[in-house]
A protein has these predicted regions:
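Select subsegments of transmembrane alpha-helices in polytopic membrane proteins
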Residues: 2, 240-249, 451-455, 459
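Alpha-helical transmembrane segments and their helix-start/interface "positive-inside/aromatic belt" motifs
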Residues: 23-34, 152-162, 366-372, 451-460
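Cytoplasmic/organellar membrane-interface segments at the starts of transmembrane helices
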Residues: 188-189, 233, 364-368, 419, ...
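Hydrophobic transmembrane alpha-helices and their helix-loop junctions in integral membrane proteins
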Residues: 86-96, 102, 112-127, 137-432
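Hydrophobic alpha-helical transmembrane segments of integral membrane proteins
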Residues: 5-6, 217, 223, 381, ...
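C-terminal TM-helix exit segments that contain a strictly Trp-centered aromatic cap at the helix terminus
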Residues: 38-50, 170-176, 250, 380-384, ...
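Transmembrane helix-loop-helix hairpins at membrane boundaries of multipass inner-membrane proteins
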Residues: 1-4, 11-106, 186-189, 479-486
Length: 487
């Protein structure tokens, strides 16, 4: 079942790509829909079946292709498969106005398989293999329309990804020398005897891993691909790039720090200080850039730069409450940002408007879609009782409880400032959308609500953004258990 959740969508995707154009669009959508549903069902079967191990190949000391389903992997598996399927269903309608649907859905299926390979990876070699596959195979989702801007965005994403991959590979090379194993074990696998006398080198190795994975996570100074790639990609691709693929960089950091190097090894060192500093800088910088941005999808891309670093700041504190907040924000941000990008896609699909200034009265034209956008915005800002409030509360209390000089108070201040900026760049679309002013001419107003294929995923995501905040108990309890195992 585990291997099927990885191989089935990849094989189906390659079959779709090799087939080329389908005579019937319904055939393409049936294959894609069945593939997405079956893959998600298989992944959920793995999640519910308890811990599973599967060793495939070994190429030498610690160089194993190995899968292990642990509590962390299960959390990410649920998020990945839920959001990927919902965005895929939305794409059935959205991609009508794009050319070469077959290519999009083929790669969409293939990347789904690589993501399951990532969340179920049992060691860093396996993780790196699927991480590279994901990076390469997701490029066509960005440069789909082959415009000059799309090609630029896709190549920028690729080059940044390759640079990050080299940094991670550097780290793996040295970890293989100084670790008992490259398998993911809570607390880390470093061999104290081998590390003795090489502590400075190992700190560089740890930082190399963090920086390498920060490319996907969008942390400064390696964030620039995000605002270039998102505006040119189709909306479903933007939704999963921001909601899911960015999180694979986050998961890579978690596996590196908490399951290989060990949190205690970098605690109180320059690595932790630089990591916290870059994360906080990115939180503020991303919010400011989003606030100033006039293009709707680019504004949401800068928002992802900021919000993903909320997660990274929580992880960098190496503190239980902060890590709980970080993992909660992984879940909440995936849902919220997918909803926001799909809302933006709905506006573009129905009106062809991309600039924020052109959205006056949009709430009167498509009220359901804009209410979905509004609920997701409230959650991202952190307005109680929506989900974002819960994760940000844990992040702030974790920072205060950490006792780390400067960061224990600077962190909450930056998070609060960012929340205010988030309100400043998200809510005007709602306000101007529903209250366009007395000079707005609605005499020729035409309802432009999308059909159910687009609306149902939007409604589900918007509902989750609120319900997960109203009923956070089970999720928080599960995440607290994960954190207790690594800190």
């Amino acid at each position: 079942m585990l291997m099927l959740s990885i191989l089935l969508p990849m094989l189906l995707g390659f079959v779709v790509l090799l087939k080329g154009e389908f005579k019937s669009r319904n055939t393409l959508l049936t294959i894609t829909g069945a593939g997405l549903a079956a893959t998600a069902a298989l992944a959920m079967g793995v999640v519910l079946s308890g811990e599973t191990e599967l060793a495939l190949f070994s190429f030498g000391k610690n160089l194993d292709i190995y899968f292990h389903v642990d509590t962390m992997g299960k959390l990410f598996a649920v998020v990945v498969n839920a959001v990927w399927v919902l965005a895929g269903v939305y794409a059935f309608e959205y991609m009508k106005h794009e050319q070469e649907e077959t290519r999009f859905f083929g790669f969409y299926l293939v990347v789904h398989g690589t993501l399951n390979g990532l969340v179920f990876a049992g060691g860093m070699v396996t993780y790196y293999l699927f991480y590279e596959l994901m990076s390469l195979l997701s490029v066509p989702l960005i440069l789909h329309n082959r415009s000059k801007e799309a090609i630029k965005g896709g190549l920028k994403y690729l080059f940044y990804s390759l640079f990050g991959a080299y940094l991670v590979l550097f780290g793996i090379f040295f970890l293989n020398r100084f670790a008992d194993s490259l398998a993911f074990l809570p607390g880390g696998t470093l061999d104290p005897a081998a590390v003795a006398g090489n502590e400075k080198l190992m700190l560089v190795v740890a930082f190399s891993m963090i920086l390498g994975f920060s490319v996907k996570a969008g942390m400064f100074p390696l964030h620039a691909w995000l605002p270039t790639a998102h505006p040119v990609a189709p909306a479903p691709a933007s939704a999963v790039m921001s909601g899911i693929i960015v999180k694979m960089g986050v998961l890579g950091m978690i596996r590196s720090v908490y399951y290989l190097v060990g949190a205690d090894f970098i605690r109180g060192t320059w690595v932790q200080t630089v990591w916290m500093s870059l994360a906080l800088l990115t939180v503020f910088m991303g919010s400011m850039l989003a606030y100033r941005e006039k293009v709707m999808k680019k504004r949401l891309a800068y928002s992802t730069v900021s919000q993903a670093s909320y997660i990274l700041f929580g992880l960098s504190l190496l503190q239980p409450a902060a890590m709980t907040g970080a993992l909660l924000h992984v879940v909440f941000h995936a849902v919220i940002k997918a909803c926001l990008f799909l809302s933006a896609g709905t506006i573009i699909y129905k009106t062809h408007k991309t600039m924020v200034a052109d959205l006056r009265g949009i709430g009167k034209e498509m009220p359901i879609a804009i209410w979905c956008y509004t609920f997701a915005s409230a959650a991202l800002i952190g307005i109680p009782p929506a989900s974002g409030f819960i994760s940000k509360w844990y992040l702030a209390t974790g920072a205060l409880a950490s006792g780390i000089e400067v960061f224990s108070w600077l962190g909450p201040v930056v998070l609060l400032t960012s929340a205010l900026l988030t309100a400043g760049y998200l809510l005007p679309i709602t306000v101007n959308g529903f209250l366009p002013g007395a000079d707005y001419d609605d005499s020729a107003l035409e309802k432009k609500e999308p059909n159910l294929t687009m609306l149902i995923p939007l409604l589900i995501l918007a509902a989750l953004a609120v319900v997960l905040g109203l009923l956070p108990g089970s999720l928080t309890e599960y995440i607290t258990g994960i954190v207790a195992g690594v800190l």
